[in-house]
Amino acid sequence: MSFAVVRMQKMKSYDLKGIQFHNQRERESKTNPDIDKERSHENYDLVNDEPIDYNERVKEIIESQKVGTRKTRKDAVLVNELIVTSDRHFFERLDPDEQKRFFEESYKLFADRYGKQNIAYATVHVDEKTPHMHLGVVPMRDGKLQGKNVFNRQELLWLQDKFPEHMQKLGFDLQRGEKGSDREHIETSKFKKQTLEKEIDLLENELKNKKSELAILSEEVSGEFKIPVKREKKSVEVPTGKRNLLGIEQKKTVMKSTGNVILKDEVFQDLKQKVKAGAVLQTRVDQLLNTDYAKENQSLKKEVKELRSTNKSLSEENGRLKSTVEHLTNEIESLYVLTKDFLKARTNDLESFKELFGVFVGKVKEKAPRGLFVRQHERSEEKKNTFSLQDVLQRDRELREQRKAKRKKSHDLER
C-alpha cells in the first residue's frame, strides 16, 4: 500500500511570483530535469481556466474579506501551499480518469475545510515523474490573515491522519506514513530536497531578472557623451626657474586649460537634455539601490544561500539514513535466518518448527505490524510458495533426514 503525502509550504509576497512561474510553466526550469516539456500542456488547474497573476488573485481574496483598514504586513504569510501526492507506483495503478478523480476529491476536501473562496489555485502537474497538486490556500479567518492559527500543529497532524483516511473511504489504496519510521523520514527528506531545488531555481530566476534591470539602467546612466568643443586650452608662458647670460629669467610656452569651452548651441542644448535624462535615471537607480529592489535582491541572495545549505544538509542526511536503513535491513535478515535455525534445531519435526516459528512471528507482528522482521518473513513465505526445482530437492533432503532419524530411533529401541 502506498503512502499519502501532504506537505505545507509558507509563501510570502516575494515568493508568489516565483511559484507562479513554476506552477504555470512560464519559464524553463534549469534545475528540475524531471519536467517533460512535451507533456506540460497536460497540466491543469482545478480553480482557474486560464493562467493568473498570483499576487493579484491573492490580493483580491484578502481585500474581499478583510475587516478594517490596517495594511497587510510586507513579511506576512499570504499563502499556505499544500503539495498533495503519493509515490509513483500509486499513480501507475490508476488510469488518467482515476488520477484526476484523486486530485479532484483532494481539492474538494480542502475547499470544504478552508473555504472555497480562499483557494487561489489548485495546479496539477502530470509532466513530472510523480503527478502532484500545488494547492494555494489564503489563510483568511474572521476577516484577517491568520496563517499561524489556521495551520497550527493540530491542523498539520489532521492533514497527516485524516487525509489518507478520507481518501481510503473514496476507494484509493493509501495509508498514513508510519509514525517515526525510517521510511517516512527518508521520503520526507527526499521530498523536501526536491522542493528546495525548485525554490532555488525560482529564486535564481527572479534574482537574474532584477540584476538585468539594474544593469540596463546603470549602462544608460554611465554612457559617455562625445562633445565637440573649442578653446578648451590656450597657450601661456610660464617661468622655467632658469636665467640666461644676461640674467633675464627664461620662460617656456605650455598649453593650459582655460576652464571654459565653446560649444555650438545645438550641441549645448543636446548636452543639457542628456544631463537631465542622466539625472533622472541616476535618481531611479539610487531609489532601486536604496529601496525595494536592492533589499529584495539581498533577501533573495541570502535565501538562496540558506536553501543551498539546507539542500546540502538534506542530501547528507538522506545518505546517512539510507546507509542506516541498509545496515538495519541486513541485520534483521541475519536475525531472521538465525532465529529460524535456532528454533529448527530445537524441534523434532518440520510441523512442530512451523507451529513454533509461526507463534514467534505472530508475537513480533503484534509489536511491529509492518516492521522489517515481519516484511522479511512475508518475502520468505512468498519465495517459499514459488515452485522451483531447488526447493523440491531441499524438501526431499529434509524428508530423507527425518526418515533416517526415525529408523535410527526405532533401531535403538529394539536393541
Curated annotation (Swiss-Prot):
This is Plasmid recombination enzyme. It comes from Bacillus sp. The keyword Cytoplasm does not apply. InterPro entries: Mob_Pre. Belongs to the plasmid mobilization pre family. The interaction of the RSA site and the pre protein may not only serve a function in plasmid maintenance, but also contribute to the distribution of small antibiotic resistance plasmids among Gram-positive bacteria. Contains conserved positively charged amino acids probably involved in the binding of the pre protein to the RSA site. Residues 23-39 have a biased composition (Basic and acidic residues). The keyword DNA-binding applies. Residues 20-39 are annotated as: Disordered. Coiled coil: none annotated. GO terms for molecular function: DNA binding. GO terms for biological process: DNA recombination. Keywords: DNA-binding, Plasmid. It comes from the Bacteria.
